[in-house]
Amino acid sequence: MIAECIKKVASHSDLSVYEAKGAMQDIMSGNATDGQIGAFLTALVMKGETSSEIAAFASVMRENAVQITPKRNGMLVDTCGTGGDGKNTFNISTAAAFTAAGAGVTVVKHGNRGATSKCGSADVLEALGIKIDISPERVCEIIDENGIGFMFAQSHHPAMKYAGKVRKEIGIRSFFNLIGPLSNPAGADAQLLGVYDSPLTEKIAEVLNILGTKRAMVVHGDGYDEITTTGITQVSEVNDGQVRSYSLDPSSFGFQKADAASLFGGDSQYNAHIIRSVLSGDEGPRRDIVILNAAAAIYLGERAGSIADGIKYAEKSIDSGLALEKLENLILLSGGKNDS
């Protein structure tokens, strides 16, 4: 299948859902050669991937994942980004995940080690003392008990090994950078998903809609794959089959405009220190951006009727110590080590 698809894509023709799924299954099953994978990825980048193609690729990745089924106490929410924005911030969506969990949202956090940054979510969680390479069954138990757990992508997507070498060798951004965040192994009902380029907000929202995601906010703010406090964020929101796009201004929620330098991160140990400081109540621009992103996750998880209400719940989560408690519990339950 993939050989025929390469020819079609090279002629700048779009793939049908059947063709896209077939090509992706060839990759995920190890039936495609490295040369075929490289040619396919390159041709797709040159043509440009359609929403239906990306959805088809993601659906196959989901089918090949080691999935888990946590108990549903309301919506299951994931907070993640594509990475690749080049901003080198601390791990904002990871801090927001603990804050949302402290507000009563069940968070099924999915992530990996950093590819384009010094520190991915897996790296910073490990630096915080969390054991990340645990069985999927144990992750499911932790989510049920703690209301937040972490699914390490390498443990849940073993078939990705077939594409890993080629992706590194060709060194170009491809649909694989997009479908990881679209392939939550717990079947998240709602997602706060940051993308590295503004035009992707609508396209990825369309993909999530095709995949049946109940609620989502796909965001890109002032160059960040986050809701930002440095400027305006472009949002494409999915809500029960409908997609609407709008701009979000942090000043309308009372946040001061942040300077980009105040959001810089570093290596995993440095970023872990920042997250623990924010969850411990330190104030300033780092707290502000975590609060704003957590508020969106709380809103998507239907624990708040609006982002404005979500901000109040996020602030309470941190100030009450509940967000930090979720972190401490995850360290303990994962069998990790707390060095704080």
Curated annotation (Swiss-Prot):
Keyword Cytoplasm listed: no
Domain of life: Archaea
Record-linked Gene3D superfamilies: Nucleoside phosphorylase/phosphoribosyltransferase catalytic domain, Transferase, Pyrimidine Nucleoside Phosphorylase, Chain C
Residues annotated as binding anthranilate 1: 81, 112
Binding site for 5-phospho-alpha-D-ribose 1-diphosphate: 81, 84-85, 89, 91-94, 109-117, 121
Residue sites binding anthranilate 2 per the record: 167
UniProt KW keywords: Amino-acid biosynthesis, Aromatic amino acid biosynthesis, Glycosyltransferase, Magnesium, Metal-binding, Transferase, Tryptophan biosynthesis
Binding site for Mg(2+) 1: 93, 226
SUPFAM superfamilies (alphabetical): Nucleoside phosphorylase/phosphoribosyltransferase catalytic domain, Nucleoside phosphorylase/phosphoribosyltransferase N-terminal domain
GO cellular component terms listed in the entry, alphabetical order: cytosol
Binding site for Mg(2+) 2: 225-226
Protein's GO biological process: L-tryptophan biosynthetic process
Listed cofactors: Mg(2+)
Assigned protein family: Belongs to the anthranilate phosphoribosyltransferase family.
Protein name (database record): Anthranilate phosphoribosyltransferase
